[in-house]
From Swiss-Prot:
It catalyses: L-glutamyl-tRNA(Gln) + L-glutamine + ATP + H2O = L-glutaminyl-tRNA(Gln) + L-glutamate + ADP + phosphate + H(+). This is Glutamyl-tRNA(Gln) amidotransferase subunit A. GO terms for cellular component: glutamyl-tRNA(Gln) amidotransferase complex. The keyword Phosphoprotein does not apply. It comes from Geotalea uraniireducens (strain Rf4) (Geobacter uraniireducens). Allows the formation of correctly charged Gln-tRNA(Gln) through the transamidation of misacylated Glu-tRNA(Gln) in organisms which lack glutaminyl-tRNA synthetase. The reaction takes place in the presence of glutamine and ATP through an activated gamma-phospho-Glu-tRNA(Gln). Gene3D superfamilies: Amidase signature (AS) domain (3.90.1300.10). Its EC number is 6.3.5.7. Keywords: ATP-binding, Ligase, Nucleotide-binding, Protein biosynthesis.
Length: 485
């Protein structure tokens, strides 16, 4: 097995036993990036010099006996995380030349463990999308089929794992942006409970929905990464002051008696036959392990997409007002005065999808429509939260598809925003409820594309979904399959 194919825990063991150095592992990974990046386009920025410098420092740390789980591990980050001294664009022209003066809290926590940063990953512009087609830096391709999308908005984070261009990655999830690409690329992706991981230093899209999480090769790595970034942060007012459990200790091959809910609103006519077949097989696997299934109802599911696209766009129109060409970012060189500079800088700097969402959000917040749209959406959000609360009185975990179809072809839904928005129909409710959910590899379509299953837990119930995911992984081999690039 090549060094770039290892998991975090496998590479950690080799580093600990001095069988390999971090510099060797990092060089192998950088060579892999060079080899496949022209076909995948998972990265916006690759940082070879910084990576090798970090790897040398990690090797010194290991030699001194000061080793943590991520010391010397090559990791890549979605280009939405501020990284001190490393360009951070959010895949937008408006931030093309932006170099942050500080690190996001999650980045600082990974650096404190001694991670090796190999680069910043492609995404949908400002995390607005489900296909990683809206990036200013070009489309990312799915390593399983280069003519298909990798999912979005954290498409680069999932594609880099599937293409073996990073040992682990970090993404963000606002309406499914970690789980959906993880499903489409055959990776493990986890969206923690809102408030579990600090959002400080993460470029904001929709502040009440955004959450930071890992994309990895297996569930063990996912637990390691979550443990590294989770925890209270006084710099983030939405961060929750709760102790961080040792997620690795939750990993158990025992789900006997675990009550798993199947929401009838998610298993509907119109679900792709390959997705349905994968879900049926996964349910049988869990039954064989002694889990119990209960049919449940999440009655307000039908309203989730409309609710999300009112709340998220409203928050985006406010959050993105700061990009005006004055203090940082793109400034139009053809402006005639201040107001013209605002208009031209934003018109030139933002892509079509970002402009669409800013306009939708501004409309929803306008005085004549605020009550009819934004306020009503917040009320429906509360009903969706209550649906999940009631469900978790009956069950421990909820099992659903991640997406209605496997990865679709690049360009297939670009001209139809509504079709694109509906591809997140099964992931959006989890963000609106503020609870945790994850995608794990569960099978393949007849065309050889990965299909994931979603496990949803109660708020701060990451240990429970990790346990359920680990048990499934131990009894299947989907996570071991590799894209042949």
């Amino acid at each position: 097995m090549e060094l770039f194919e290892l998991t975090i825990h496998e590479l950690h063991d080799k580093l600990k036993k001095k069988e390999v150095s971090s510099v060797e592992a990092t060089r192998a990974l950088l060579a892999r990036i060079d080899a496949v990046e022209p076909r995948v386009n998972a990265f916006i920025t690759v940082t070879p010099e910084e990576a090798l410098k970090n790897a040398e420092a990690a090797d010194r740390r290991i030699a001194a006996g000061d080793m943590q789980l991520l010391t010397g591990i090559p990791i890549a980050l979605k280009d939405i995380f501020l990284t001190k001294g490393v360009r951070t664009t959010c895949a937008s022209r408006i931030l093309d030349n932006f170099i942050p003066p500080y690190d996001a809290t999650s980045v600082a926590r990974l650096k404190a463990q001694g991670m090796v940063l190999v680069g910043k990953l492609n995404q949908d512009e400002f995390a607005m999308g489900s296909s990683t087609e809206s990036s200013y830096y070009g489309k990312t391709h799915n390593p399983w089929n280069l003519e298909c999308i990798p999912g979005g908005s954290s498409g680069g984070s999932a594609a880099a794992i599937a293409a073996r261009q990073a040992i682990a990655t970090l993404g963000t999830d606002t309406g499914g942006s970690i789980r959906q690409p993880a499903s489409h690329c055959g990776c493990v992706g986890l969206k923690p409970t809102y408030g579990r991981v600090s959002r400080y230093g993460v470029i904001a899209y929709a502040s009440s929905l955004d959450q930071v999480g890992p994309v990895t090769r297996d569930v063990t790595d996912c637990a390691i990464m979550l443990g590294a970034v989770a925890g209270f942060d006084p710099k983030d007012s939405t961060s929750v002051d709760l102790p961080v459990p040792d997620y690795s200790k939750a990993l158990s091959n025992d789900v006997k008696g675990l009550k798993i809910g199947l929401p009838k609103e998610y298993f509907i006519a119109g679900l792709d036959p390959d997705v349905q077949k994968t879900m049926d097989a996964a349910i049988e696997t869990y039954k064989g392990l002694g889990a119990q299934f209960v049919e449940i109802s999440l009655p307000h599911t039908d309203y989730a997409v409309a609710t999300y696209y009112l709340i998220a766009t409203a928050e985006a129109s406010s959050n993105l007002a700061r990009y005006d060409g004055v203090r940082f970012g793109h400034r139009s060189s053809e402006a005639q005065g201040l107001i013209d500079m605002y208009r031209k800088s934003r018109s030139e700097g933002f892509g079509e999808e970002v402009k669409r969402r800013i306009m939708l959000g501004t409309y929803a917040l306008s005085s004549g429509y605020y009550d009819a749209y934004y306020l009503k959406a917040q009320k429906v959000r509360t009903l969706i939260m209550q649906d999940f609360s009631r469900a978790f009185e009956e069950v421990d975990v909820i099992l659903t598809p991640v997406a209605p179809t496997p990865a679709f072809r690049i360009g297939e839904k670009s001209a139809d925003p509504l079709q694109m928005y509906l591809s997140d129909i099964f992931t959006i409710p989890v963000n609106l409820a503020g609870t945790c959910g994850m995608s794990i590899p569960a099978g393949f379509s007849k065309d050889g594309l990965p299909v994931g299953l979603q496990l949803v837990g109660r708020p701060f119930g990451e240990e429970c979904i990790l346990r359920a995911a680990y048990a499934f992984e131990q009894n299947t081999d989907w996570h071991e399959r590799k894209a042949s690039l």
